[in-house]
Every structure is written in structure tokens, then in C-alpha cells.
Amino acid sequence: MATFDDGDFPAQTHSPSEHEDFGGYDNFSEAQQPPTQHQSGGFSSFNGDPASPNGYGFGASSPNHDFSSPFESSVNDANGNGGGSGGDAIFASDGPILPDPNEMREEGFQRREWRRLNTIHLEEKEKKEKEMRNQIITEAEDFKKAFYEKRDKTIETNKTDNREKEKLYWANQEKFHKEVDKHYWKAIAELIPREVPNIEKKRGKKDPDKKPSVNVIQGPKPGKPTDLGRMRQIFLKLKTNPPPHMMPPPPPAKDAKDGKDAKDGKDAKTGKDGKDAKGGKDAKDLKDGKPADPKVTEEKRPSPAKDASVETAKPDAAASGEGEKPVAVTEAEGTKAE
């Protein structure tokens, strides 16, 4: 059996008269063949002429737009420059898409200059920042050194001042405790001003606008009474329950014995003097001739010692009366004689 590849064609079943124009391949000559038009990237289309055997229709012209391929323009502009695939090769490269590097350098001159200036500016800025950073670090180190030196100096000064204040405080406390049992009011007056700052400090945290109840007034002011509530409170507290350091020290045993003997002698002496004074008063009353008040004598009966003193005073008064009588008589007699 003959095949198409072998070049054997089947016999014609119709007469040559049925096709006047085309009787066979022998009727065509090389001069009568129509010219073929090739266009890069195009697809062949049937326009009444047989398609070109070159490339199975690729590159053939398609004047009839009704049978043209819709992808023809896209194939022609495959590489973006309208060249399409050049020559007989399909999808052939037409060169690099980007332009020549030399042309790029010429086109980017301003940008390259800007980048160069920007790089210089950034380098200068970074250099200034480093210098500023080093300067700040140096100043910080100097400040830290000066701060620590000042702090150490302040600590030493505070230590010295605190030691002196502590010594003064203990000296004042010792002096206060020694003299507090002698002058209570002076001790109270010294305690009140010390407690006022503490009261103000405690109340200042809660309500700073509220004034303390105790106001220290230096000296009397007319029309403004001094608040003595705190003074009375401390006085009553010290009077009812005095602390041990305010109690008077007890006297030694020997001094107490001597004091007791002296007290007994003093009482005896004062009693004797009082009795003598009483006796002298009674004698004076009798001497003047004024009798003693009976009511007083009844209410205050004299003691035996007093009676004895009165009895001894009476003879003296009588004797003095008798001695005065002769003097008066002699004076009267002298006048009569004259």
C-alpha cells in the first residue's frame, strides 16, 4: 500500500475538466508561483494562496485580518523593542534588555554625584558624632570624679559635726538631769520648745495647713494669752509620776543622822524661845495693868511651863510696883514741903 511519505499518490477519480485552473502539480511552473512574504513572529493564514512550506506558515504575511491570529502583536513585541524573534530562529534574543553600562553611567551622573556628596556628608556627620560622644564621656567622667570627691568631703564634714553635736547633746542632758530636781519650771520651759518642732514635723505630713496647738511666744503680749496647756500637762505628769532621773538623790546615812540631831536641837531651841516670848508677853500685859482676856485664857490654857513663867513674872512685876511707889511718895512730899 502506498503512503503519503513514499510519494505515491492515489489515482484521480475525476476528470481534469472539472478543475480548469488546477489540473495538477505539473501545470505550475516556477515563474507562476506567487511571491511569499515573511514577517517575523507572525502566523500564516489562508488567503487563497497556498501557505509557504518554510516553517509551516510561521513568518507568512496575513493581509486578511479576519483570519489573523490575536497573538501576533504579542509575539512581535516579545522582547519589548518591537523586533520579535529575528531571522529564522523562533524566540531569538535581540540583546540585553538594559542599556549599555556606559550609557547608564552617562545618564546617572547627577545621581552618582549626589551619592558621592551624601557619602561625604555622612562621613563628616559620623565623625562629629564620635567627637561629641567622646566629649560627653570625658565630661561625664570628670563630673563623676568631682561628685565622688564632694560626697566624700561632705561625709567627713557631717561626721565631724555629728560627733560635736552628740557630745554637746550628752553634756546638756547630764546638766539637765542634775538641775531638774531643783528647778521644775525651768526644766519644763526647756522641754516645750524642743517638742514643738517634732509636733510640726509629724503634722506636716498629714495636714500642712493645720497649725500646732502649742505656740511658743517669746515674752508676754497684751491681749494674746499664752497657751499653757502643754506646760500644765507636763507639770502634772512630772508631779504625779516623776522619772527616776528627776528624783532627788537620798542623803547618806551619816548626813541623815547629823541632820536629825540638828533638827532636834533646833526644835528644842525654837520651843524654848517661844515659851520665853509667851511669858514675856504675859508679863508685859500684867505690867501695863491690863488683865488678860478671860475668853482667850479659857480657850488657850497655858501649859505648866507657861504657868511657871507667868508666876515668876508676877513677883517681878510686884517688886517693880513696890519699888516705884516710894519714889512717887517722895515726890509728893517734896512738893508739899515747897
Curated annotation (Swiss-Prot):
Question: What's the protein called, per UniProt?
Answer: Clathrin light chain 1
State whether it acts alone or in a complex, and with which partners, per the record: Clathrin coats are formed from molecules containing 3 heavy chains and 3 light chains.
Q: Where is the composition biased (Pro residues)?
A: 241-253
The Swiss-Prot or TrEMBL record describes its family as follows: Belongs to the clathrin light chain family.
InterPro entries linked: Clathrin_L-chain
Which residues are in coiled coils?
122-142
Say where the protein is mainly found.
Answer: membrane
Which is an annotated GO molecular function term of this record?
A: structural molecule activity
